[in-house]
A protein has these predicted regions:
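Short boundary/linker motifs that mark transitions into or out of structured domains
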Residues: 1-33
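Residues that recognize and position ribonucleotide moieties
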Residues: 11, 49, 95
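Short amphipathic alpha-helical recognition elements used for nucleic-acid or partner binding
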Residues: 29-60, 80
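DNA-recognition element of transcription regulators
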Residues: 31-40, 66-85, 100
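Short, solvent-exposed secondary-structure capping/transition elements
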Residues: 51-52, 86-93
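Short helix-coil junctions and helix-kink-helix linkers
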Residues: 59-67
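A short linear beta-strand->loop->alpha-helix hinge motif most characteristic
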Residues: 90-104
């Protein structure tokens, strides 16, 4: 059985499929690329704690044999923000703390 996470009672996240699904209308979905899906999973697992950029690099890319640049990291965070907005989430669900990290 696939592990799922509910975000703000509005969206279901299925990491194995890289899928964000609107709970109120399951026909509204957004597919994430694997790095973006791993970024979101890491944020969820940290339960509101700030995650350092270097931790993302290690957990999302390096452990999986990939290289990453700061630009690639920020592009994936931006992709997550757009996905949440596309599904109707208002406000900034992903918060960037300059020179510190990112939190959900």
């Amino acid at each position: 059985m696939e592990k799922t996470y509910t975000i703000n009672g509005i969206i279901t996240f299925i990491p194995q499929r890289g899928a964000l699904i609107l709970i109120a209308d399951e026909t509204k979905t957004v597919s994430l690329n694997m790095p973006a899906s791993r970024c979101l999973l890491l944020l969820i697992q940290q339960d509101g704690k700030t995650v350092a950029r270097e931790t993302f690099f290690e957990e999302v890319w390096i452990k999986h044999g990939s290289q990453v640049t700061s630009n690639g990291f920020y592009q994936n965070i931006s992709l997550l923000r757009r996905a949440f907005k596309e599904l109707g989430m208002e406000g900034d669900i992903i918060i960037t703390l300059p020179r510190v990290g990112v939190r959900l």
